[in-house]
Curated annotation (Swiss-Prot):
This is Glyceraldehyde-3-phosphate dehydrogenase 2. It catalyses: D-glyceraldehyde 3-phosphate + phosphate + NAD(+) = (2R)-3-phospho-glyceroyl phosphate + NADH + H(+). The active site is at 149 (nucleophile). NAD(+) binds at residues 11-12, 32, 77, 313. It comes from the Eukaryota. One of its GO terms (cellular component) is cytosol. One of its GO terms (molecular function) is NAD binding. It comes from Drosophila pseudoobscura pseudoobscura. Pathway: Carbohydrate degradation; glycolysis; pyruvate from D-glyceraldehyde 3-phosphate: step 1/5. Homotetramer. The record marks 176 as: Activates thiol group during catalysis. D-glyceraldehyde 3-phosphate binds at residues 148-150, 179, 208-209, 231. Belongs to the glyceraldehyde-3-phosphate dehydrogenase family. Keywords: Cytoplasm, Glycolysis, NAD, Oxidoreductase. The lineage of its organism: Eukaryota, Metazoa, Ecdysozoa, Arthropoda, Hexapoda.
Amino acid sequence: MSKIGINGFGRIGRLVLRAAIDKGASVVAVNDPFIDVNYMVYLFKFDSTHGRFKGTVAAEGGFLVVNGQKITVFSERDPANINWASAGAEYVVESTGVFTTIEKASTHLKGGAKKVVISAPSADAPMFVCGVNLDAYKPDMKVVSNASCTTNCLAPLAKVINDNFEIVEGLMTTVHATTATQKTVDGPSGKLWRDGRGAAQNIIPAATGAAKAVGKVIPALNGKLTGMAFRVPTPNVSVVDLTVRLGKGASYDEIKAKVQEAANGPLKGILGYTDEEVVSTDFLSDTHSSVFDAKAGISLNDKFVKLISWYDNEFGYSNRVIDLIKYMQSKD
């Protein structure tokens, strides 16, 4: 398997490393200009949300050493200056949240990276969602996006529903856990005034492009879905509410059966299914992109339904970053 570099050792960067270890992928380099290697050890070892790292982690001679494997550490602010080639990194995960366009992410190629995977939606890079549109990947693509955690939750469910019952139109709401861009107390937040309100005190209506992005990965749904978010005071795990009008009438039991069929078949490991009495913390560190909650959904009639699906917005997504890289490697 080709070797991976990670740019930005924040929530996603660190969890991509955990996911890589779980999946037997090789991370050989990490770049972060804001934390030194000793701080990396601390942040990787202790995690308030997912718990302590179960393996060994140490700093030795400037390297980050995880489970005995040496990882080269860079501290460059400009991606063009990161010497990925010296560490043997071919696939770079761009997880700073800053370099999200083809132009900006392409600077990694100057340092020897062969491919770049942006761990965020991108304005112009081709977007991929595992289980949905990987067949559209072409080896000549140098920079790709793994879309957003919410698009990764919504798209597999929307695919199953559209393939079987045809989505005429729909609205999505994500009830979304707090993320690092939010404020601990009220503060200025540019043009998005509500986003600057205290995260622990409020339910905050917010914009999200996740539903519209589904139209990019499932062209048949382009223009048929849009959505919004509520940011809520929980540290992790979010839930999508997809309310759709169907072209082909179906009972809620028929819908459940098709989702379960996909979860046990072509979308196994990506789309999950539960009929238990679950709540958000039951999905902490869940590796699925999306877990359909059979007991939470409702049907008004055979053509108008509300479907509910949970996701660990940090760890499920980080696992898909590695899955996307593995898929790319199989085709390159």
